[in-house]
Amino acid sequence: MKPIAAFQEYLEVERQYSPETVTAYLSDLQEFQAFLKANGGFTDFRHVDDLDVQTYLTDLNKQDLARTSIARKISSLRSFYRYLTRIDVVKRNPFELVELKKQHHHLPQFFYEAEIQELFKTVAGKTPLDQRNRALLEVLYGTGIRVSECAKLTLNQVDFNTALLLIHGKGNKDRYVPFGQYAQQALRTYLKDGRQVLMAKSQAQHRYVFVNQYGRPITSRGIEYILDQLIKQTTLTANIHPHMLRHSFATHMLDHGADLRTVQELLGHASLSTTQIYTHVTMAHLKNEYMKYYPKHN
């Protein structure tokens, strides 16, 4: 089996990564291979040396890519070569010691609570799509799960008796996330009415919770499109991205006194340091409010 095909099987079977994650890895490997072919020829991954790596890094930097994009590409290649060393295809990993300059961390964008209320006013209708969109917003904002996790949510992962969602997270790690009365009510209405109507349009039977207008399972990109359309119905001007509801959930939980480790568990973060970025968000929010309303600054 060729190295890339073997690595793909490893990611899918052993690591059980999502199709989106596997596709991202393979895209990075193929891009590196294409670069080598265009710059001196490519013979075999076993013959890649430090000079090849440095030349590729230089080219990436010249493309004016975001640091996060470069870091992801290097991470993919490092993981690939770790796998090749593990199965004794190569003796050393040429990407093992590659380091990028430290990134300046931008604080996550989030909705203020008043903005959340305005956003929810856009899904007050009773059509099947309104019911779906209401349930979608309630679940995303009320649980903080990732958009990809929401898209993959199935009926057997929803337990109304315990008010818990079983979430299959990154790295094949499962966690239980509670969902409150608003999400429960919205989900019950959608599953009883709206989803039934939408599913009647599809010949395929499946157990995914959220479906598109044709009754087919919704995708992460589909959720992003829905959010974009809902935002256009409001006065909000922020550059919206799907994770803003997740960021808003974490920020508002901390604002209202939630313990940091509790938020970490709910978000499914492997490291507490990942969750701590939201404490900086809340502090920045407090400082902005202070500067805005403190009498000496008015």
Swiss-Prot record:
Report the subcellular localization.
Answer: Cytoplasm
Q: Does the keyword Zinc apply?
A: no
Provide this UniProt record's keywords sorted from A to Z.
Cell cycle, Cell division, Chromosome partition, Cytoplasm, DNA integration, DNA recombination, DNA-binding
Query: One Pfam match, by short name?
Result: Phage_integrase
- Domain of life, per the record? Bacteria
Query: What InterPro entries does this protein's entry cite?
Result: CB, DNA_brk_join_enz, Integrase-like_cat_sf, Integrase_catalytic, Integrase_recombinase_N, Integrase_SAM-like_N, Recomb_XerC, Tyrosine_recombinase_XerC/XerD
Offer an example of a GO molecular function term for this protein.
tyrosine-based site-specific recombinase activity
Q: Name one GO cellular component term.
A: cytoplasm
Annotated GO biological process: cell division; chromosome segregation; DNA transposition
Decide whether keyword DNA-binding is in the record.
Answer: yes
Q: List the disulfide bonds.
A: none
HAMAP family in alphabetical order:
Recomb_XerC_XerD
| Cited function | Site-specific tyrosine recombinase, which acts by catalyzing the cutting and rejoining of the recombining DNA molecules. The XerC-XerD complex is essential to convert dimers of the bacterial chromosome into monomers to permit their segregation at cell division. It also contributes to the segregational stability of plasmids.
This chain belongs to the protein called Tyrosine recombinase XerC
